[in-house]
Amino acid sequence: PGQIEKSAVNLVAFAKTAVLEPEQSQELTLTFDLYDMASYDSYDMNKNGASTYELDKGKYSIKVMNNAHELNECENAEIEFEIASNLNYKLDPKTKQIVKNRFTGDTAYAGVPIDGSTAGSKIEYLSRGNFGETFPVDATPNRSGAEVSKANSYVYNGYENNERYTTAPKQGQNYGDEHLRLWTRADGSPATTSDLQGTGGVELKLNEELVEKLGRNYKAPEWEQLLNEITEAELYYLVECSGYSNAEMVSIGKAKNYDYDGPSGLQANAGTPDGVDKGKWTGFGGQMNLAQTFNIELAFSMGRTIGNEAQATGISGWYAPGVNLHRTPYNGRYFEYYSEDTVLSGWLGAYVIKGSLSANVYCYLKHFALSEMGQNPTRLNVWVTEQALRETYLRPFEIAVKEGGANGVMTAFNRIGGTW
């Protein structure tokens, strides 16, 4: 009572030895931050006026374990320490951004809390503090068709006085002689649509100086100008017509790139460049097989191998890895995801991404977020507390972005709470 609800055991770090012969040993170093042990207090359960990542005061144990239940037999396998007063993370230790509730209460995104507190009926969440009273016994009956139709027709009207949503940026701006282009023809003239699609039969030249500036600093002024130059029609086309590719943009000299599925290796679907021999792509086992190895070096090798195959066959982006969690046996996409553990999933995904990026192939981390319910769960409302969202379902994505350098994300089909 008076503290944030938390599990008894959490994985914070893991490592794997080489193959050891009898009498051989190996020293392993495990590192983590106190932030990795923190709980998210979405409802201010410890009454300190903060809703952020926190460590409650009290005793903690760091254990070297073989699994979630079995302590390792090594020396000093358990170390206890005490935190004298609550530790709050007002800023994210890596990004330095403010940490606060974004999906709970009156300040929730789009005005719709994801915990269902404004949905008109109480949602009882399972609690470790009271399994008997909170464990569901009877299935919740389906709502009537009229109720579902009413819910589906809901429109959020809170955008009217928000400049962020009501003022569209001016697109298609022309900067004359200072106009920025990623690719031009070899003579410096603007590339055409067919040129950027690779069918124009002309040699193109990359603006290496511009690309280096853009890649070095996301706050570079060149980014603002480049985005201003893109036409509105090109933006729509990029969003609406980019399955297994991302479209060319004549306004900025962006070439068409091909992107491909999936987490177990490039899949032989339609849409690859002409002349690609898909039969030479490698099919890997399900991702839970990789997870069972606890081997981040192997994850890196897998990512690099697929990245090399992609580069050799004209593929620039990869729809992978998938870091959704195993929550039920009845999901036909679990071969694409690693495990039920957030930290294991996040770190394996991070190293797969590192491997792919080392071969100059970018990744689309997926499926963001809460897509644990099956085959592309469309029109599904997933109700969850912000604590569970952050600690469980978003954590693998957080690790993969912060530690793996993911620079692409594939969104899910479901709603989070009542918001899509």
Model-inferred region functions:
Residues 1-49, 53-64, 68-70, 105-106, ...:
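Glycoside hydrolase catalytic-domain context in secreted enzymes
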